[in-house]
Amino acid sequence: MDGTIENFVIYLHDVKKTSKNTEVSYERDLKKAAAYFKDQGIEDICESSEANLNSYMLYLEREKFAPSTVSRSVAAMRTFFQYLMKEKRIVQDPSEHLHPPKVEKKVPEILTVEEVDLLLSQPDTRTAKGLRDRAMLELLYATGIRVS
């Protein structure tokens, strides 16, 4: 593999300006895929075919990986093979027709009226900080903003 994955991670950082979390996740996903391919007799992940990638996706699903994990792995491989194309390491992108599984979006949990009342009653509105905190809580509640 001659440092190809490591060079890809450097490319993500330096050129794509990705987050550290993306870089760590993609590196882990690609190394896991490389280990799978090695077990299948493919020494270099760069030599993977479309059929190999589909086989790997089925393996992840059989092993009960979450759809979000499989989806991220697809994203990692697609970005990796696009990088290899850009670097002229491969002539055809085997991930071109790779599609991630559908990831169900979770319905956000909402607070009851009683919980909202309790939350809004917490700041001590007799102080400046309490008034500020109450105003922030009211703003968050009124706009429906959420933590992502």
What are these regions (language model features)?
Residues 1-148:
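Conserved catalytic core of the tyrosine transesterase superfamily
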